């Protein structure tokens, strides 16, 4: 691989730093690129952008690679954040990381990398890419299934995967930390980032309240009994237990309360008691806005596995239909709190086939 130019997305974290080091050891000409995807609150107690950039510079200096910063904030607000607000306004719970990967990290970033003369890009994602016997590129789970991030990458297409390297896909996370310590990376003990990137560590409701108005309404049980008031449907997600404002049962049971449904027309939030309440369990779902890694949908009747949220175990299912921009899945066992706005992602073993945005569950 000597001399081939690769642009590595460097965030200031351990994973992308080790990625850059590994590729340099393999003989690549490595250029580090730091993406600034959010303009606001640079001086906020919750914003780490400035420190992240300083970490990138320190790592680049240590391992001997050139690094630059590029601002994709305008693209991010237009392609990702606007959709995020639309989805919450409609009562759904989006996953902006999925859209960010497809539109920013593997589109705007990829285009910029190609303008720098790179042949490929690389990121610190835990996933794998391989080319099969037919010449198509496949997206696979990372060998370390506990850290696998293929769920967030399922919208990547053939052109994107053909130009992408995921060096950490073959390495356990524990080994990545060991490498960082062994080579003396200044950020070797830095915590992994969690949550939505533009929200950071700030309270989610506080952030969302800056952009969406609160519209209080009744909180009801399935039989119509009013048990409280919600602050606005956008501020709740299906399966949510904390932050509802209800203690034990009004009828004496100590079971926890969960958000079960949202009725946008009447501005009603329905809550139920007990983790396994029937309203939280659904055997089928419908998804739209589909994207398939190979460019083609699976055949109706095919037995697959699916995730309806990150970190969920693969759930056996059958493809009831995959026509045009509509996917219907029937699960072997009813799934818990299937949430409109989240992604339903299909797998055939370790191979990620793609998926779509959940529209409804029944």
UniProtKB/Swiss-Prot annotation:
S-S bonds: 100-197
Example GO biological process: tRNA wobble position uridine thiolation
EC number: 2.8.1.13
Binding site for ATP: 9-16, 35, 124
Signal sequence, start to end: none
Span list, region Interaction with tRNA: 147-149, 309-310
Pfam families linked: tRNA_Me_trans, tRNA_Me_trans_C, tRNA_Me_trans_M
Gene Ontology cellular component list: cytoplasm
Superkingdom per UniProt: Bacteria
Main location group: cytoplasm
Annotated catalysed reactions: S-sulfanyl-L-cysteinyl-[protein] + uridine(34) in tRNA + AH2 + ATP = 2-thiouridine(34) in tRNA + L-cysteinyl-[protein] + A + AMP + diphosphate + H(+)
Compartments reported by the entry: Cytoplasm
Region called Interaction with target base in tRNA, residue ranges: 95-97
Active site: 100, 197
Site location (Interaction with tRNA): 125, 342
Key words, A-Z: ATP-binding, Cytoplasm, Disulfide bond, Nucleotide-binding, RNA-binding, Transferase, tRNA processing, tRNA-binding
Listed GO MF terms: ATP binding; tRNA binding; tRNA-uridine 2-sulfurtransferase activity
InterPro entries: MnmA-like (IPR004506), MnmA-like_C (IPR046885), MnmA-like_central (IPR046884), MnmA-like_central_sf (IPR023382), Rossmann-like_a/b/a_fold (IPR014729)
Role: Catalyzes the 2-thiolation of uridine at the wobble position (U34) of tRNA, leading to the formation of s(2)U34.
Family: Belongs to the MnmA/TRMU family.
Full protein name: tRNA-specific 2-thiouridylase MnmA
């Amino acid at each position: 691989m000597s001399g081939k130019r690769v642009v590595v997305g460097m965030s200031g974290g351990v994973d992308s730093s080790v990625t850059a080091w590994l590729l340099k050891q393999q003989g690549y000409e490595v250029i580090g690129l730091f993406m600034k995807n959010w303009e606001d609150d640079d001086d906020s107690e919750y914003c780490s952008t400035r420190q992240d950039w300083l970490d990138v510079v320190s790592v680049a200096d240590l391992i001997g690679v050139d690094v630059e910063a590029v601002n994709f904030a305008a693209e991010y607000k237009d392609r990702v954040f606007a959709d995020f607000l639309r989805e919450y306004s409609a009562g759904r719970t989006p996953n902006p990381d999925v859209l960010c990967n497809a539109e920013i990290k593997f589109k705007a970033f990829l285009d910029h990398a190609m303008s720098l003369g790179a042949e490929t890009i690389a990121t610190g994602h835990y996933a794998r890419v391989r080319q099969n016997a037919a010449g198509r590129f496949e997206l696979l789970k990372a060998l370390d299934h506990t850290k696998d991030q293929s769920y967030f990458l399922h919208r990547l297409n053939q052109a994107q995967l053909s130009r992408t390297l995921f060096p950490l896909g073959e390495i356990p996370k524990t080994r990545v930390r060991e490498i960082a310590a062994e080579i003396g990376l200044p950020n070797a003990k830095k915590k992994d980032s969690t949550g939505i990137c533009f929200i950071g560590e700030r309270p989610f409701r506080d952030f969302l309240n800056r952009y969406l108005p609160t519209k209080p309404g009744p909180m009801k049980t399935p039989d119509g009994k009013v048990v409280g008031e919600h602050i606005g449907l956008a501020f709740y997600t299906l399966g949510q237990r904390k932050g509802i404002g209800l203690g034990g049962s009004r009828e004496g049971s100590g079971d926890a309360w969960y958000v079960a449904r949202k009725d946008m027309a009447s501005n009603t939030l329905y809550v139920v008691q007990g983790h396994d309440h029937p309203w939280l369990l659904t055997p089928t779902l419908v998804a739209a806005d589909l994207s398939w890694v190979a460019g083609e949908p699976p055949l109706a009747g095919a037995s697959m596995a699916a995730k309806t949220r990150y970190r969920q175990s693969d759930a056996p299912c059958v493809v009831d239909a995959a026509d045009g921009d509509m996917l219907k899945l029937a699960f072997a066992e009813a799934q818990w709190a299937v949430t409109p706005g989240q992604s339903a992602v299909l797998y055939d073993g370790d191979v990620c086939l793609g998926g779509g945005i959940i529209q409804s569950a029944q």
